[in-house]
Amino acid sequence: MSMSDPIADMLTRIRNAQMVEKKEVNVPASNLKSAIASVMQEEGYIKSFSVDGIAASKTLNIKLKYYDNKSVIEKLKRISKPSLRVYVSSSQMPSVMNGLGIVIVSTPKGVMTGQTAYEQNIGGEVLCSVY
């Protein structure tokens, strides 16, 4: 059976792993998922990630981050879905929790935070929000 929304699956696996306080979570790998994990690592929401395995069975191993026994990620929400894509220009870039969180945006120049896309004056598809 094929997966209809692999990004939502990745975010759900991260949420579920954090609810039971796991140190790491494994997700089927793709270039887009690796780019999202890279942005989350740069922003300090996860410790690290690595791609393991060979061609067809690559997995993304994400090491989760905790502070005072609480998850660093308070909320992880998918915004643009296969059934309803959400595209924004740089002037319409949403803010999360008045700047305390981030939105992850897929742009023609790659996957980046909404703030970076705003500074570079480029729009794109809003994939998810993290805070």
Swiss-Prot record:
Gene3D superfamilies: 3.30.1370.30, 3.30.1490.10. InterPro entries: Ribosomal_uS8, Ribosomal_uS8_CS, Ribosomal_uS8_sf. GO terms for biological process: translation. Keywords: Ribonucleoprotein, Ribosomal protein, RNA-binding, rRNA-binding. Part of the 30S ribosomal subunit. Contacts proteins S5 and S12. PROSITE patterns: RIBOSOMAL_S8 (PS00053). It holds the Pfam family Ribosomal_S8. This is Small ribosomal subunit protein uS8. It comes from the Bacteria. One of its GO terms (cellular component) is ribosome. One of the primary rRNA binding proteins, it binds directly to 16S rRNA central domain where it helps coordinate assembly of the platform of the 30S subunit. PANTHER family: 40S RIBOSOMAL PROTEIN S15A. Belongs to the universal ribosomal protein uS8 family. GO terms for molecular function: rRNA binding; structural constituent of ribosome. It comes from Ruthia magnifica subsp. Calyptogena magnifica. The gene is rpsH. The lineage of its organism: Bacteria, Pseudomonadati, Pseudomonadota, Gammaproteobacteria, Candidatus Pseudothioglobaceae.
